[in-house]
Curated annotation (Swiss-Prot):
Pfam short name (any one): ThiC_Rad_SAM
Gene Ontology process terms (BP): thiamine biosynthetic process; thiamine diphosphate biosynthetic process
Family: Belongs to the ThiC family.
GO molecular function: 4 iron, 4 sulfur cluster binding; carbon-carbon lyase activity; zinc ion binding
Region feature Disordered, mapped onto this chain: 1-31, 100-141
Gene3D superfamilies linked to this entry: 6.10.250.620, Radical SAM ThiC family, central domain
Protein's name in the database: Phosphomethylpyrimidine synthase
Pathway: Cofactor biosynthesis; thiamine diphosphate biosynthesis
Record organism: Streptomyces avermitilis (strain ATCC 31267 / DSM 46492 / JCM 5070 / NBRC 14893 / NCIMB 12804 / NRRL 8165 / MA-4680)
Amino acid sequence: MTNKDARTPASSQTGEALASPQGDQEAGKSIGWHKAYVAGSRPDLRVPVRQVHLTNGESVTLYDTSGPYTDPSVDTDVRRGLAPLRENWIIARGDTEEYAGRPVRPEDDGIKHTSPRGGLRNLDAVFPGRPRQPRRGRDGQAVTQLAYARRGEITPEMEFVAVRENVSAEVVREEIAAGRAVMPVNVNHPEIEPMIIGKRFLVKVNANIGNSAVTSSIEEEVEKMTWATRWGADTVMDLSTGRNIHTTREWVLRNSPVPIGTVPLYQALEKVDGRAEELTWEIYKDTVIEQAEQGVDYMTVHAGVRLPYVPLTANRKTGIVSRGGSIMAAWCLAHHKESFLYENFEELCEILAAYDVTYSLGDGLRPGSIADANDEAQFAELRTLGELNRIAKRFNVQTMIEGPGHVPMHKIKENIDLQQEICDEAPFYTLGPLTTDVAPAYDHITSGIGAAMIAWWGTAMLCYVTPKEHLGLPNRDDVKTGVITYKIAAHAADLAKGHPGAQEWDDALSDARFEFRWEDQFNLALDPDTAREFHDETLPAEPAKTAHFCSMCGPKFCSMKISQDIRREHGGTRTEVEEGMAQKSKEFAAAGNRVYLPLAD
């Protein structure tokens, strides 16, 4: 894990400044960037930021999701895991207890009792970090940030995200208490750097990782997680469906500085050899507890896929495209019974409240093609999600709502408007949406368009789409492309919404561009490495980093250089400009106020 891999230029190119351990750091003013920390009200509350030092002596502070991996003063080791940042905060509240937990079974990793344990691949399989017992609320208490917020308490986690978001801690508490924002922070994931999801805050981006029966290993998934967070992923979902699901998840959680989400239904299905009709509430419940004990911060639950809604998909062009949705539809039809997730939802609420696991209520009937957008099945499920959201709130469980999908541009706004109305403004978490179906290999672009639009109108978190969508499992480069694409969409929405400080980043880069400060442009970019690479393809020499032109227009046709020349030759102070205008007015009057003057002989 080197700094060269970070969401920042390599240190050898920028003269990277090391971060000091003090709050609100200004350590190391060399040009480039360094990891810094803004101090809170207590010694153990230090909020990470990326500070970019510019060649003009100014600096820009940016939101940072990369965790300790980009702090050269921290010795990270994936076999040891990250330091438990929140552990003392959790213990100090006095409302949780450690307990033995459920035993880890072979089937948790998709292995039969008769199978050898040797199916685990890479990283020596079982996580070797410090032994830990799971923690849960005492005596059935809800130990959720929602419960605290409703009691008027401002937790250290709330203060942490307030500093990150450049808002007051009271705003954070109010939004969580109202159900308009969630903070996924399982008590068993103390390594997390708290973040918040809600329409009053910065638009967040989720990256998906996960193995499958066809490809990938534990080591690859851990590396994908750290890679995604370095490029700006605010949360990561582990959607593993192959072997080693439990073990992969343990490695990911112990090394993740961001919230980790899952779809418990996938692992439950593995436990019954992929036969949906053999699923039971007991198997699903056990899987949820297993994942909650490990520290999963939010879970997608497809409780809105009900038996009466399945026939509504019969005339669709692409039917049910959600994996979780199709599993639950198959179960409902096999038993001709109501969904066990819907019928046992209140018991599920009690479980999640004991660990502070956030609901991500799944859109199992989302449209999988433009033709199916905004149909009866989609909105029937949405109405049920609104009902379930209100039940979850009774149990003090934080809740967000998942959304589509494939939606043409003219139908996007209806989705966010209905969701906000039906679900009492609970945070909306959408997959894109994809605005056209004609671009396999470019669906990060088709969906990025929809993502920017729906985030502008109020979606709180965007689930990224990579170039491999509909084609295969994304690799490392695909993950980076997906994250960068969606960070662009999210930031564009932050600008449109007028989020505090959002435009400062753009203004800093615009100034650097106009003043031909190439290194500053690279260092301020979402993807500094690619920006530098593209520039150097045509102007690789070091003096080109100070040239007042690039290879697109050359020195004679650069519009910004011409603009600078005009300012230099004809510009001046505002007073000088106004005096010049007044003089021209007098000359016009002296000429008889004539618009057209006679031609000279």
